[in-house]
């Protein structure tokens, strides 16, 4: 999936461009002055809904449900001047379906410096919590890190990748921060956003989509009402998931479970064309076909879904160019 730009809205007329540049310059002068004397936290937080929705529509292949749920939840949360709790999203689905891509887009379109922002915190089990025997130290460090950074900036984004590989018991230290009753002195921690990413529930999502296809239902007809329960059960039944016995799901601290559907051949083709455009290359039928031919689709008797979504598209394009 192609990398994001700050806004994918095309330029309009020359007059409109001149006005936009003038307005941007005036806005920059005022905001720069304010940021020099004010809070860098608030200045770094610059939501761009138009850019986000445009990028999701153009580059996120086959995920009507995820796109709708994320945008709706985010808009409702940010339009509330006094939210009662942080926004907590849990992204679920097969590998390569766009979970990490969406989380990176959120960072990109919410913060001026995107993933490089000091207010965006990205955690990976392999990098940050590699040794299960150090669990108690990790719990202490994680709680301290979250509380300290929320004290500095309430508009913080915390991304937790590969929840399937996170040591059970670690994430329970976040439980007080995800509800409405915790007190972090000096800041409104309820303005924070937490995003959890995992493959758990992917098989169950795939099965629902496969059954819909067999029943000749459009995938756009699949809703959260039929996917939410199977995802929740898959998480609760998985002793290796970071939410295992954490109380987070049991106490309903997740605002939205976001399902990512398996990708079909035409979705992978969409990813290939997007990646070629991102590289500044014209569409080449032989490259597109070569990537599709090298992609494994499942199930074996009905090769419908890509086994790794669009995850390998970029590397395969480089190989076939």
Swiss-Prot record:
| PANTHER family attached to this UniProt entry | TORSIN (PTHR10760), TORSIN-2A (PTHR10760:SF4)
One GO cellular component term of this record is:
endoplasmic reticulum lumen
Q: Give the gene symbol.
A: TOR2A
Residue numbers binding ATP: 93-100
Where mainly located?
endoplasmic reticulum
Q: What is this protein called?
A: Torsin-2A
One Pfam family from the record: Torsin
Tell me the keywords, alphabetical order: ATP-binding, Endoplasmic reticulum, Glycoprotein, Nucleotide-binding, Signal
**UniProt lineage:** Eukaryota, Metazoa, Chordata, Craniata, Vertebrata
Q: Which family does it belong to?
A: Belongs to the ClpA/ClpB family. Torsin subfamily.
Q: Provide the species name.
A: Bos taurus
Q: How does it assemble?
A: Homohexamer. Interacts with TOR1AIP1.
Which residues are reported to be glycosylated? Answer: 149
Give the GO molecular function terms.
ATP binding; ATP hydrolysis activity; identical protein binding
């Amino acid at each position: 999936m192609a990398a994001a730009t700050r806004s994918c809205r095309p330029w309009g007329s020359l007059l409109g461009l001149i006005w936009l540049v003038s307005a941007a310059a005036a806005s920059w002068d005022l905001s720069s002055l304010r940021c020099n004397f004010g809070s860098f936290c608030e200045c770094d937080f610059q939501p761009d809904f138009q850019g986000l929705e445009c990028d999701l529509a153009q580059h996120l292949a086959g995920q009507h449900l995820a796109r709708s749920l994320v945008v709706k939840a985010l808009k409702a949360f940010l339009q509330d001047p006094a939210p009662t709790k942080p926004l907590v999203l849990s992204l679920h689905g097969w590998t390569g379906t766009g979970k990490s891509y969406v989380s990176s887009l959120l960072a990109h379109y919410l913060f001026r410096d995107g993933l490089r922002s000091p207010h965006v915190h990205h955690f990976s089990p392999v990098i940050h919590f590699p040794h299960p025997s150090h669990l108690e130290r990790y719990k202490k460090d994680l709680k301290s890190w979250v509380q300290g950074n929320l004290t500095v900036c309430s508009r913080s984004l915390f991304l937790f990748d590969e929840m399937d590989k996170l040591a059970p018991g670690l994430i329970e230290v976040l439980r007080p921060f995800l509800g409405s009753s915790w007190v972090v002195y000096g800041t409104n921690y309820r303005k924070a956003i937490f995003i959890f990413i995992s493959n758990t529930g992917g098989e169950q999502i795939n099965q629902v989509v496969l059954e819909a296809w067999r029943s000749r239902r459009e995938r756009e007809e699949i809703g959260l009402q039929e996917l939410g329960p199977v995802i929740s059960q898959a998480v609760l039944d998985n002793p290796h998931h970071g939410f295992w016995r954490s109380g987070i799901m049991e106490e309903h601290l997740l605002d939205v479970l976001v399902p990512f559907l398996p990708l079909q051949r035409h979705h992978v083709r969409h990813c290939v064309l997007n990646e070629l455009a991102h590289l500044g290359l014209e569409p080449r039928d032989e490259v597109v076909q070569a990537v599709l031919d090298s992609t494994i689709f499942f199930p074996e008797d009905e090769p419908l879904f890509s086994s790794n979504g669009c995850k390998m598209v970029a590397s395969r394009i480089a190989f076939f160019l």
